[in-house]
Swiss-Prot record:
Transcription regulation in keyword set: no
UniProt biased composition (Basic residues): 106-118
Region of interest (Disordered), residue spans: 70-118
GO CC, alphabetical: mitochondrial matrix
Keywords tagged on the record: Chaperone, Mitochondrion, Transit peptide
Job description of the protein: Assembly factor required for Rieske Fe-S protein RIP1 incorporation into the cytochrome b-c1 (CIII) complex. Functions as a chaperone, binding to this subunit within the mitochondrial matrix and stabilizing it prior to its translocation and insertion into the late CIII dimeric intermediate within the mitochondrial inner membrane. Modulates the mitochondrial matrix zinc pool.
Protein's UniProt name: Mitochondrial zinc maintenance protein 1, mitochondrial
BP-aspect Gene Ontology terms: mitochondrial respiratory chain complex III assembly
A molecular function GO annotation: protein folding chaperone
Organism encoding this protein: Yarrowia lipolytica (strain CLIB 122 / E 150) (Yeast)
Top-level lineage group: Eukaryota
Subunit structure, interactors included: Interacts with RIP1.
């Protein structure tokens, strides 16, 4: 029971952080979170499905806290947005995108794999 309450509070805090200045989206997120927990209220706490649901909701909280950043367009004439970054926002360096791993060009027996353009 306490794990469920902890997960519920965790995801609500993450939603509050991610959607801080967007009252409509924050309200929709809170309603969706509440509905999800209400649907799971009747489950047996010892059921394996409860553990899966708790892992899922903690994952959602992590993504909301670290990956979701909202932007606001201040001037309609410009394509510039003010991003609402916070201390938990994950900043990547894109190094893995700049140098992707080499793609295999041969099949299992050393034969060239046919491509759709060949």
């Amino acid at each position: 029971m306490s794990q469920g309450l902890t997960a519920y509070r965790n995801v609500l805090r993450a939603a509050n952080l991610a959607f801080k200045n967007d009252h409509f989206v924050l309200g929709q997120a809170k309603a969706n979170i509440r509905k999800g927990f209400e649907d799971g209220r009747k489950l047996d706490p010892k059921d394996e499905d409860v553990k899966v649901r708790l892992e899922h909701i903690n994952g959602v909280a992590y993504v909301l806290r670290t990956q979701v950043v909202q932007g606001q367009k201040h001037n309609p004439d410009e394509e510039k947005y003010q991003l609402n970054l916070h201390k938990d926002s994950e900043m990547g360096d894109n190094e893995s995108i700049k140098s992707p791993p080499p793609m295999p060009t041969k099949g299992k027996k050393g034969k060239k794999v046919k491509c759709c353009s060949e």
